[in-house]
């Protein structure tokens, strides 16, 4: 009704109040405005009613048709509702759906029963068939029809799914599998007995016999080929041939390798009625038994003859059978050839490596012949014999490396680390020149021989191929490192005490340190280019330098500790004016002197002069400093006591004259001993102070003489207080000493 729609859209309240400002929402409408609005809305309402009435009158027929159609639709809906109600009433009175469901369930159950019975029948038929097949197999086995029995065993293995068992299978299947297993074991045992009967080795006549017509128990006239075919069918070829392969390897192949020069194999065939019934291989003494098989030609020829006999007489040229026999024997044959022949003909000298080429060629030809016979698989990429022979340089170098390391280890273990008293022998074997310091040094025989071995090995590196040179280089490094690993452990007990072995170890390490540093300069230029890239020795040199210092420092520490214990027995040199205390102090000094002389006797002949001087000075400094300190710590000394103390000091210095002279002679600078051993000057001065007047002591301090002797102000003052009684003069002297700035 477009007209009605247009009428409603034409109503606009704003137009009805056109005279009023409606833009301002806060402006209220007045009573006249509202009355005007009501009047105008009533007018519009009348107009709308008039329009609607006019529209209905104009479309009366259309509205009549619409109402009639609606009435017909309602009537039909009522009829359909009545029909549906009737159907529902009918269904509720007779439940046909329940009857249909019951029939369907019954049909399903019967179908399942029929299917189950059919499956059970099929299972029974299958079980009966398998049982009959197993029985036929047993009968065939008894009658000697091995090929038929073997094929049945193979078929039944598939049917019974041997090795593929599943949970929930019928119990009958488990029983049938057990029966099949028993049948398989039986045929395997029977075939093995026939094979054992077929191949025999007679020790007395040294021959191997292969029979072609076999019999075991009541079963006779079985062909060897039939037995082999049956074993192949059921997959026990390796098992069946294992015993024969072991016998042939032990009694035929092994002599062919170990006694190749005295071995000869002669093949013979035995015929009956035109058929070959037996093949024989006899081992005879070779007429050329005095000939030495240098290049392995006789050995390879003998083995090849045996293999050909096996391929033709035992395996009948069947590739599968030959492969099986080869798998069983070739690994052992190759290992035997390597251990008994190839490893023993590896050259012992690098110059003889070229002569080994003939053996390499003959070995390659031998393996190629075996591959041609299918004895060795052509896909076997190992070619273990050829590879071993071609790698002879590596084997040679490996063996030489083992020999070098064994020699190095033996000389280190056998050396007793002592120096003979015979000077001539010492000069000949134990004195070496240090490479960088140009000093002569006494070393152990082990160190000198070890470096001789290293030098010889590195000389071989310079003239060897890359692979050999690499092994020799590693052997040289490892030989040096063996010293570090072996000697300290061997001398472990000696290193815990004062002895010649410890200082020899120090010298050895120093000598090895300088020698190792010089190795690269001496040989690296002549090394093969591949070795130059990584050939270094400087990385292992510092550890020997460090070891030398540690050993020497430990010796010095042990000596100083021993001397301190000896000095401790003097009880601080107290009361030496008493006979008992004096004897104790004197014994302590004698012990110190004896120990120092013993150290002198051990160190001086072995250590370098410079090292001897430094070490002995450290020891003497410790002794003199300790004795001077103990005496200066005395807080009260009688006149007789100072005399006895002075006597002890002079006695000690006199008895140590030889030791002090050795230090003086070892010093290249010719400096006074007092400068080399500061506490020696202090000890000597202390002996003078013990009988010096008070004023002289004071003057000596004021002049700086005592300060230059390493006395401190406190030591001088305490010394004066200990010797001299309290008096104005002592106070004055102490004051004067205190006033001097030094």
UniProtKB/Swiss-Prot annotation:
Q: Which GO terms describe its biological process?
A: cell division; chromosome segregation; mitotic cell cycle; protein exit from endoplasmic reticulum; protein transport
What functional role does this protein have?
Answer: May be required for accurate chromosome segregation. Required for proper maturation of seed storage proteins. Forms a complex with MAG2, MIP2 and MIP3 on the endoplasmic reticulum that may be responsible for efficient transport of seed storage proteins.
User: Chief localization class?
Assistant: cytoplasm
Oligomeric state and partners? Interacts (via the central region) with MAG2. Forms a complex with MAG2, MIP2 and MIP3 on the endoplasmic reticulum.
The cross-references to PANTHER family, in alphabetical order and at most eight, read: CENTROMERE/KINETOCHORE PROTEIN ZW10 (PTHR12205), CENTROMERE_KINETOCHORE PROTEIN ZW10 HOMOLOG (PTHR12205:SF0)
Where does it localize? Cytoplasm, Cytoskeleton, Spindle; Cytoplasm; Chromosome, Centromere; Chromosome, Centromere, Kinetochore
- Which top-level group of life is the source organism from? Eukaryota
* UniProt-recorded name of the protein: Centromere/kinetochore protein zw10 homolog
How is the protein disposed in the membrane? Peripheral membrane protein
Kindly give the InterPro entries that the UniProt entry links to this protein.
Zw10/DSL1_C_sf, ZW10_C, ZW10_C_2, Zw10_middle, Zw10_N
List the GO terms this entry assigns under cellular component, sorted alphabetically: endoplasmic reticulum membrane; kinetochore; nucleus; spindle
Keywords annotated in UniProt: Cell cycle, Cell division, Centromere, Chromosome, Cytoplasm, Cytoskeleton, Endoplasmic reticulum, Kinetochore, Membrane, Mitosis, Protein transport, Transport
